[in-house]
Amino acid sequence: QGVBBBZGLFSAR
């Protein structure tokens, strides 16, 4: 799932 990361980019956690 692509969630908004801390840096402001979409990363799959």
From Swiss-Prot:
This is Fibrinogen beta chain. A long coiled coil structure formed by 3 polypeptide chains connects the central nodule to the C-terminal domains (distal nodules). The long C-terminal ends of the alpha chains fold back, contributing a fourth strand to the coiled coil structure. The keyword Disulfide bond applies. One of its GO terms (biological process) is blood coagulation. Keywords: Adaptive immunity, Blood coagulation, Coiled coil, Disulfide bond, Hemostasis, Immunity, Innate immunity, Pyrrolidone carboxylic acid, Secreted. The modification Pyrrolidone carboxylic acid is found at residue 1. It is found in: Secreted. Conversion of fibrinogen to fibrin is triggered by thrombin, which cleaves fibrinopeptides A and B from alpha and beta chains, and thus exposes the N-terminal polymerization sites responsible for the formation of the soft clot. The keyword rRNA processing does not apply. Cleaved by the protease thrombin to yield monomers which, together with fibrinogen alpha (FGA) and fibrinogen gamma (FGG), polymerize to form an insoluble fibrin matrix. Fibrin has a major function in hemostasis as one of the primary components of blood clots. In addition, functions during the early stages of wound repair to stabilize the lesion and guide cell migration during re-epithelialization. Was originally thought to be essential for platelet aggregation, based on in vitro studies using anticoagulated blood. Heterohexamer; disulfide linked. Contains 2 sets of 3 non-identical chains (alpha, beta and gamma). The 2 heterotrimers are in head to head conformation with the N-termini in a small central domain. It comes from Hylobates lar (Lar gibbon). GO terms for cellular component: extracellular region.
